[in-house]
C-alpha cells in the first residue's frame, strides 16, 4: 500500500478506475518506461511524500518508510529528454567551440611564405602598440622650446620649408623619446604634471618605444636624401648618450663632479639635441656658406640646463609638473648642488641627502635651506646672468647688423631669472 501523506484522506482502492489499478500493479521499471514515453519531462524518481519545513512527514501516524528516491543512471534520464530549439542551438554552438582542432601539419613550413615584411604584415594596430608610450608623452605637450629655437636660427640659415618641416619633426621626436628613457633611468614619477609613461605602460615597453622612435626619426631624415644629415644624426646621438652616461654614473656612485665636468656633460646631453637641429639646418641651408651658429647654440644649451637645475629646486611650477625638488629625490648633482657641496666639502649633510634619494618634503626643504646658506642659488643666478649676456653679444656678432636677432633675444629674455 502507498503511504498517505494526510490522515484526513483515506485510500479506497475500489473507488479507483481500472486504468489506475493497472498502473498501481506495474513494477517501478515498467512505470518508468511508460512515464518516459508519455511525458518526456517527467522526474526520474517518484515524488516523495509531503513533509513539513522540518522534514518530518505531516502525518503523525505515518510510519517510517524506506527512501522513495532511488539512483537512476544519468544516461537513462538524459536520454528521455528532448531539448528545446534554443537549448539545442546553444549547445550546438558550444560544441563547435570546444571541438578539438586537427593538429597543424609541420610540412606547411616547406612552402608557406615566411617573408613577414613591414608592407605585408605590419598594421596600424601593431604600430599603435609599439608607439603607445611615445604617443602618451606627446599627448601632454611641453613648451616646444626646440621648435622656437629652430625658428629663431632659421632667420640666418634660410632652410627650405620642406626640409625645415622634416628637421623640426625629427628634433621633436628625438626630444620626446629621450624623455621616455630619462624618466625610466631617473625613476621619475611625473612628467609635465602627469604620471610618467613607464608607470602606465611598464618599463620594458617604454624603453622599447623610446628606442623605436630614434630609428623612426632616422628614417625621416633619409627622406631628404642628404648623407651629411645621417652623419650629424649619429654623431650627436653618440654625444647625447655620453652625457647621459656620465650623469647617471655620478648619481650611482655618489661622485660629485667639478663644474667643468658638469659643463662638458651638459654640452653632450642637453646641448647635443640643440646642436643636432642647428647642424641639420646648416646642412640643408640655402647658399654655399651658412652662418656658423654652433657656438651660440652650445651656449644656449648650457643656459637652458643650468636654469632648469635652478628652477627644479625653487619653482612652484616645476614642483607641480615634476614633483618638489625632484633632482634631490633622483640624487642628481645639478649645478647648485655641485656648488654647495664644493663650497664646504667637510659638511657631508647634502651629499648624504642625495644618497638617500628621499621623497620626504621636510628633508628636501632642509637641503634647499642649506644650499641657500652656502650661497649656491645666488651663485647660479649670477652665472646665468653672465651667460645670457654673453649669448646676446654673440647673437649680435652673428647677425652683423642685419637686425635679425629678435627671435634669439626673445628666447634669452624667457630664460633670464628675475
Swiss-Prot record:
Coiled-coil residues: none
Source organism: Fusarium fujikuroi (Bakanae and foot rot disease fungus)
Catalytic activity, reaction form: isopentenyl diphosphate + dimethylallyl diphosphate = (2E)-geranyl diphosphate + diphosphate; isopentenyl diphosphate + (2E)-geranyl diphosphate = (2E,6E)-farnesyl diphosphate + diphosphate; isopentenyl diphosphate + (2E,6E)-farnesyl diphosphate = (2E,6E,10E)-geranylgeranyl diphosphate + diphosphate
Site features described as Important for determining product chain length, chain residue numbers: 214
PANTHER family, alphabetized: GERANYLGERANYL PYROPHOSPHATE SYNTHASE
UniProt protein name: Geranylgeranyl pyrophosphate synthase
Residues that bind Mg(2+) 1: 182, 186
One GO process term, biological-process aspect: mycotoxin biosynthetic process
Domain of life according to the entry: Eukaryota
Keyword field: Cytoplasm, Isoprene biosynthesis, Magnesium, Metal-binding, Transferase
